[in-house]
Amino acid sequence: MSRSAEEVEATLQIAKVDLEDLRNTVHCLTFSSDFTSGDYSLMELDDTLCKQIEAGDSLVIRGDKSDHAVLCSQDKTYDLKIADTSNLLLFIPGCKTPDQLPADQQPLTIINCEIAGFSNHYWELRRCRPKLKKLKKLLMENTYNGPENERESQDNSLHTTEDLLNMIQASNEELVDHLKAIHACSINGFWRLLDFDYEMKLLNHITQLIDSESWSFSKVPLPVCLQELRSLEPEEMIEHCLTCYGKRLIDEGTGGDFFALDEDKICRATALMLLQNAVKFNLAEFQEVWQQSVPEGMNTRLDQLKGLALVDRTSRPETIFLLKTEDLPEDTQERFNTLFGMREKWAEADIAPYIKDLCGEKQTIGALLTKYARSSMQNGIKLYNSRRPLS
């Protein structure tokens, strides 16, 4: 139902509102004939997401029925939370805001608008960590152990990038970055994890060749490496292993590709090989065997094992055992409960590698410890224990 200018002025008089205090444009609102509540949802976006939507990019809501839904852009993941409003929010196509109206509009103008929907809540977005724990478990169902060990029928347990995006709560960039971090390899369009023993076999071929050719670890020529090892393993596997344990560079003189191997990554992988089948390892014996096991010229250090292994200085003799960050719960409180269940008190240097990935944007490890742990001094060392009683 539309209103005349006279009816609008009469309503303003009843409300004791002076027309001169208002703009000379009035919106007359009516409900749409096909209006039904609950047809629309509102979502609050920051400037970055707004620009992505305006540019034609997509936002995707991901999660199984049992998951808490998250929203993903191309490179970030956001937690979705419903926020209630005290006022009813109306959806009015064609409604003009003050900046869209002329300042000196005369005379009184009436714009008839239909209310298409309403809501008393909206979706609030908060940046969160991608939920990637399930990814490695999926890929471990069918690891790659060399061409001679491939099964003929295995497509049901193989996954493309699109398959993984439908199962993992992460953005495309976060997913691909994590696939690279866990050394996954794209084989015939499917993402595969190399069997760890096979990966170490590839690495051993490379380090033995480096030794026989007297190459520097910082300059391993890719073409020669592929040519020498192609009779042993597929070239793409050799190159993948070099990518996992080194950095590709260009020789300024020849223009050829070469790799600079990362000592820390190779020492870390060797330690994992030694520790994975032992419950605990005498620390002194482990350090001796570890140094003997890495390629000659490389030096092992305990700080290479952050987030992979934990040293127990209280036992006699001192011991070391495998404790991987990726095996701990993703939820922050559950992570702290698990860690404090293993050890009542932690020094910051020991616990930091296991909670670093929990820090949000602009959040420090110290702030995280303040929130979830209590500190105390023992023999001049600050130690942290759980804020909550552990069941």
From Swiss-Prot:
Pfam families in the cross-refs: Dcc1
Cysteines joined through disulfide linkages: none
GO terms for MF: DNA binding
Residues forming coiled coils: none
Record's GO cellular component terms: chromatin; Ctf18 RFC-like complex
Keywords, comma-separated and alphabetical: Cell cycle, DNA replication, DNA-binding, Nucleus
GO biological process, one term: maintenance of mitotic sister chromatid cohesion
Main location: nucleus
Subcellular compartments: Nucleus
Function: Loads pcna onto primed templates regulating velocity, spacing and restart activity of replication forks. May couple DNA replication to sister chromatid cohesion.
Family: Belongs to the DCC1 family.
Quaternary data: Component of the ctf18-RFC complex which consists of ctf18, ctf8, dscc1 and the RFC complex.
Protein name in UniProt: Sister chromatid cohesion protein DCC1
